[in-house]
Amino acid sequence: MRRIIIKNTKNIKQLTFDIPNDNGVYLLVGANGAGKTTLLTCLDRICNPYAFATNFTSANNTNNIDQYSASSIEYITEHAHIKFRKGTRRWACTPRTNSSPLLKREFGFENTIFIKADSKRIDVPQEEIRSGNLVDVESTIIESLNKIFETTKYNNLKRLRNVNGRGRNSTYFYILKDGRKYYSEKRFSTGELAIIRLVERLQTTMSNSLFLLDEAEMALHPRIQKNLLDYLNEKATEKD
């Protein structure tokens, strides 16, 4: 048994969710506001100690009311019971000692990757697209994108290696070459860019990871959605 119990968190009054024992691709279906993203955040917390701090932030209001003051999130297995509650400044858990490694070990995942449906996933400020060194994209990524979108245009997909303004870590942006012209990802559609990011992350994801994708349909044509689902099933089998 690998169970999560969520109470009084976002739009969820109470939810008991059992993680399937079999590896594979699973779809969460529900109306807008049903709490799907909240559940995905709780799943992300299995391996990501910053999941709650990043995604469960209190909205600013004049009454200084913490919307998570009555929240609780429990993780239960046959050998462990870990409970999180929102304290004054941060989420606290019981037991306090070694809770993160215990949670990861008991639920049996090496890592969690959460790709959220937000602007950070699909938007890059125009000022961040500067000159840099163009490098080839891995052939496995190109092949996967061509197959999903039923095209060959990604044969000329490139990365732009870009050192940020403060000289720190390099960032990669996708550039599509068309003759002598290069198109930055600012010209890509939302669904197109989201799948590029998705495929890139899946290529480097270690086996036995929990990969979480919010709003998987991403305004895609139903035929492309089917191709994407087939691709995800292939990767789930490959990284079992």
Question: Can you say where each PLM-predicted feature lies in the sequence?
Answer:
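Switch/communication elements of ASCE P-loop NTPase nucleotide-binding domains
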Residues: 2-34, 44, 184-240
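Generic detector of short, locally flexible boundary/turn motifs and exposed helical patches
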Residues: 37-44, 81, 135-138, 162, ...
